[in-house]
């Protein structure tokens, strides 16, 4: 095994896992938290629309530029 990878394995194996109690004391642990997953879905949808719009605008600008000033390739 490469010494570099041995160091990485040793580094990660030396860390001890830490468990944090994030639930309040009088909460049922088996009930899923729906509000966090919904907010992530909303942000993901907005980000997807933003990236799609940006890609479309960039493509239109590129096509228009190629029509007006075509690039001459060197041979």
Swiss-Prot record:
One of its GO terms (cellular component) is membrane. Its main location: membrane. It is a single-pass membrane protein. Keywords: Membrane, Transmembrane, Transmembrane helix. Pfam families: YKL023C-A (PF23521). Residues 19-42 are annotated as: Disordered. Residues 19-38 have a biased composition (Polar residues). The keyword Chaperone does not apply. The chain crosses the membrane at residues 47-66. It is found in: Membrane. This is Uncharacterized protein YKL023C-A. It comes from Saccharomyces cerevisiae (strain ATCC 204508 / S288c) (Baker's yeast).
